[in-house]
Amino acid sequence: MSETKKLQGKVAVITGGTSGIGLAAAKLFVKEGAYVFITGRRQKELDEAVKAIGSNVTGVQGDIANLTDLDRLYKAVATKGRIDVVFANAGVAEFAALGKITEEHFDKLFEINVKGTLFTVQKALPLLKDGGSIILNGSVASVKGAAAFGVYGATKAALRSFVRTWTSDLKDRHIRSNVISPGPTDTPVIDGQPADAIARIVSTIPMGRMGEPDEIAKVALFLASDDSSFVTGIELFVDGGRGQV
């Protein structure tokens, strides 16, 4: 007797689905029976991701900070008639120490990580099925201070605040809202870092290594599926213990 797939017949939206955690989640969701819409800012990378996922996927080019792009995304999603899962994964990380923070740096991070995430979810609501799942991609930086990461950490702390509020806002629709907060993860964001910087990062993680995108994707699958039917309003750390010590 074959095992039932955890997302059989469900429709999921994953922003930032062309690489790293978003791509890993899209592959896993499709494997578990979902039809997935992914977004990315660059068409070439989007096309490559769609090819890598292979089936039951539509790619929609766009920037989550651009509300017109979000409208275009949900116009495409509307062809499926509903959404069961929103994984607001897209975001940006940049360093700037206090004293060197520019208005441009501040505005860019809040525009994408906070405004973009908020409107990704809000514009999904008309299509989001009662009993559906909202998942935000946060960061251990929401609770763990890191040099020159003050603005980024503040944007991720805002996501924690969002899910607390949305749990109440959406309770009558039984829509669950949770945030995954990864620690340092081996994604393209890390690729450009010097070896000594990566070594310093790893030294702060009790498990002695960075996370893998697939490990974060498995947690997203848990929160997307009925396995987490009584889980809402939480920040779930997937950080190798970094934020806990």
What are these regions (language model features)?
Residues 97-98, 102-110, 190, 201:
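Substrate-binding pocket helix/loop in short-chain dehydrogenase/reductase
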Residues 2-3, 8, 144, 221, ...:
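Short C-terminal tail/terminal secondary-structure segment
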Residues 139:
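Residue(s) in the substrate-gating loop at a strand-loop-helix junction
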Residues 179, 200-227, 231, 238-240:
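C-terminal helical subdomain
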Residues 126-127, 168-172, 229:
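Alpha-helical segment proximal to the catalytic Tyr-Lys
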Residues 11, 18-19:
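Conserved glycine-rich cofactor-binding loop
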